[in-house]
Amino acid sequence: GPGADQTYFYSSPKRPMTFAVTQLVEGGRDGMVATSRDDVVRIGREDADMNFPEDIFMSGTHAHVQSQGGSFQLVDDGSRNGTYVRVDGSRELKHGDYVFLGKQLLRVEVTA
């Protein structure tokens, strides 16, 4: 309904997320979780969906995970130190895959 001044507020419908990337911390516990926006999760030291500003082994824009035609790709964005499995371009990911970037261990969770 309208607000107190009879103003109606509208917004775009929320798109459902298709996957999440979860940081694993000491002891195997879940840490930070980033859900996909526009079928992409960006990972880096700054201006990313998952930011790790203290990780000197992580590039500013290190890598991203993207959903593409029902598969999931890990794309290295020209990082200086690469990933646990060096990705020169892209690599398909599936639910439960682990990725190591800088000093961060992440798990991909497909929810769609």
Predicted regions and their residues:
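Intrinsically disordered, low-complexity acidic Ser/Thr-rich regulatory segments
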Residues: 1-54, 104-107, 111-112
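Forkhead-associated
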Residues: 32-103
